[in-house]
Amino acid sequence: MKTFQRYMSESVGQAGLDYELKVHKAMLAAKIPGLNPGDKPGAGFSNVGAGDIEASYNGKPFNIEIKATSNDQMGGTAFRYDYATKVFTPVKEMDPEDLNLLMAAAKEKSKDIDNYIKAARKLEPVQYHKTISGIPLKVSKEGRDKLKKDGFLAKINKNVKTSERFIVRHYNKKGVYYINVGKAGLFYMGKNPLKLPVPSLKGEIQIEMRLGYSGGKHSFPTDPITPARTAGLRVQGRLRTKSKSDYSLDNIEDIKKLFGIEK
C-alpha cells in the first residue's frame, strides 16, 4: 500500500510531466518556421541535457525549464547526511537539476545539522550515542526531547529562501535561459539570447528542510532498556514567483504572437 506522502509525490511528478507534454504539444502545433521543440518529454530523469524541453530556434539553443505552477514543487526526497564528508545523498532518484539546486541550498544548514549531531553524541547512554555518524540517526527518546527543548531541532527545521540570482546562476550554468511557468507564462533568466519579448523572472526558491522522527519504537540494550527513536532528513524545494508574462508556451496563439506569426 502506498503512503499518502508517496502518493502525493508521485502525483506532483505526474502533473509536472503532463504540463511539459502540454507545452511540447503546443510548440509543435504552432508550426513556427525555424522552431524545433526537440524530443518529447518522458518519464524518468536524465543526467545529461539542459532544461525540461531542449528546443531550438533558427539553429540557436532554446532550452526551457518547465514548472506547472508559480508555487511549484521542485522535487523532494529523504536525504542521508554524512557528518565526516558533509555530503547529502538522496535516497531515491530525482531530477538532477532540482537535486543539485536543493543540495546547494541545503548545505547552508550543514552547520546546524553538525551541531545537532555533536549534541546527540553526548547524550546518555553515551556508549550508544557517541558513534552517530550522520543522518539517519538513532537517539534515546529522552534525548530526542532534550535536543528539541535546547533548540537544536528548530535551527534545522527552518525554511531557506534563495534569491532569483541563485536561480539564474543555477540554470545558466546548464545553458538554460528560459522558464515557462503554468498560469504565469514565459520568462528569461539572466540573459535573453533569443531577444524574445518576455520579462525577466522575479522570484525565489524556498527550501523546506525537516528532521523528523518516526513513530516506530526502538531501544538501546541497557539495563533496563532505554527507549529510542530514529530520525530522517527530508528536503523539499518550492518555486515561488508572482511574475506575469504576456506569453505562455502552453498556448498556441501565444506562441504564434511571440514569434511574430500573428499580431
What are these regions (language model features)?
Residues K2, M94, V139, Y247-D250:
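Short coil/turn linker and secondary-structure boundary residues
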Residues Y7-K25, G42-V48:
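A short, highly charged nucleic-acid-interacting micro-segment common to nuclease
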